[in-house]
Structure formats: C-alpha cells, structure tokens
C-alpha cells in the first residue's frame, strides 16, 4: 500500500498512478532491498533519451546531428536530471538503506538522477509513451528553453580544451583520485590539473567520464572568477 506521503507526491510530479507499486519501486534505492529501481532506471534512461531527442528534432528543424546530440547530452546528463529531482523534491521521497541514508544519499547527484529515470519508466509502464511525454517534458521545459537554438553549449571538457588550445597551452591532465561502491553504485573522484596556470580542481560522478566533466566545469568556474 502506498503511503500518504507518496500519494501526495504524485500531485507534485503531475501524474497519479494506476499501479502505485511502480512508483514505490522507482523510489526504492538498491541499498533498501528489493524490488529496487535499477531495472526501471535502465528503461527510463532509454525513454528519456527518446523523449528529449524527439522534442529537439521537432523544435530545431535546421539543427544538424551534432547540435542535436550535444543538446540531448546536456539535457539528460546526470547533473541536469539531479537538478530536476531537486526541483521536484524527489530526494525527500527516496527509500534508502541505512548506510546511504546516513551518508546523505538523498542529496547525491547520481542517486537523484537514477531516481528521475526510474520514475519516468514507472510512468511509461503505468500508462503509455504519449502520457509519459505529456507528463515528463514539462520537467525539462526551462532547460529546453534556455538552450541556444541549434547551438547548445559544448560540454565542460571540450570548452576547457578549446580555451587552452586557443592560448597554445598544455591540455589538462585528468587523474583518478579514488573510486568506490559496488558495480551498480560506483562513485568516482577525479582531479583536473592545468600546468601553466598552477590550477587543480576536483570533480565527482557515477562514472569516470562524468567526474572528469565535473572537474573541468570547476576549472572553468575558477578561470571565469579570475578574469
């Protein structure tokens, strides 16, 4: 049976489930036992990529494949999904095991992003793709509107590399500081070092690639603040 808290939360996300157990599963992290949300996360990843690709294809009729791909990547990346989760106060609804709860898992980007994908899959399974589209796309509307039409911002690693190359400086060096977690809940910390500038930043993410992007983003922020 769904709790009154979870029942109220359906109003916040804009969808009332026919089968509330799907929502409960979407909110349950693997640390809290089964049935957890990993399978839903897998499906939701594909569903959200389809919905965003479709929306961009329709909104940007003259954009080439590269621009569409970069825009989709920007909208569905971990930090973007985590931001949506925070807007919807999803972290407060998550069902976590004692360890994750104690370590603040309800605030971690990777867990929040995975939960958003799981909720999207739950809506898709409970209803259909058309309903899922109607419910989910408004979550992305602010980010969609903010993207420069046909020319979405490049990812942080690319932007940092191009900035350094324009000044004929050495490329950044990324190094793994540590990785933790089991195969399904990996967490990485990576450093980004800019030799000539004597600048070193760190980033975190659920994959090494995401951690490097986060470190590059922090480096860009430092460079911008020093202008």
UniProtKB/Swiss-Prot annotation:
Gene: rnc
Keywords for this protein: Cytoplasm, Endonuclease, Hydrolase, Magnesium, Metal-binding, mRNA processing, Nuclease, RNA-binding, rRNA processing, rRNA-binding, tRNA processing
Localization: Cytoplasm
Skewed-composition ranges (Basic and acidic residues): 203-212
Major localization listed first in the record, in broad terms: cytoplasm
Domain DRBM stretches: 155-225
A biological process term (GO) from this entry: regulation of gene expression
HAMAP family in alphabetical order: RNase_III
Natural source organism: Xylella fastidiosa (strain 9a5c)
Ranges for domain RNase III: 6-128
Protein name: Ribonuclease 3
């Amino acid at each position: 049976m769904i709790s009154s808290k979870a029942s109220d939360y359906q109003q916040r996300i804009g969808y009332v489930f026919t089968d509330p157990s799907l929502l409960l599963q979407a909110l349950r992290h693997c640390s809290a036992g089964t049935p957890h949300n990993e399978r839903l996360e897998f499906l939701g990843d594909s569903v959200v990529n389809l919905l965003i690709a479709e929306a961009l294809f329709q909104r940007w009729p003259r954009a080439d494949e590269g621009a569409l791909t970069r825009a989709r990547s920007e909208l569905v990346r971990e930090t973007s999904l985590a931001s949506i989760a925070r807007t919807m106060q999803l972290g407060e609804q998550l069902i976590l095991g004692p360890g994750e709860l104690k370590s603040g898992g309800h605030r971690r980007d990777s867990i929040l992003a995975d939960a958003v994908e799981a909720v999207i899959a739950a809506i898709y399974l409970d209803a259909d793709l058309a309903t899922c589209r109607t419910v989910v796309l408004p979550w992305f509307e602010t980010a969609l509107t903010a993207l420069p039409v046909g020319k979405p911002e490049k990812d942080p690693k690319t932007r940092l590399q191009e900035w350094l190359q324009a000044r004929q400086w050495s490329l950044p060096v990324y190094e793994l500081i540590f990785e933790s977690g089991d195969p399904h809940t990996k967490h990485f910390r990576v450093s980004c070092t800019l030799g000539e500038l004597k600048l070193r930043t760190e980033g975190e993410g659920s994959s090494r690639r995401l951690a490097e992007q986060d470190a590059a983003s922090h480096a860009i922020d430092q460079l911008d603040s020093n202008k």
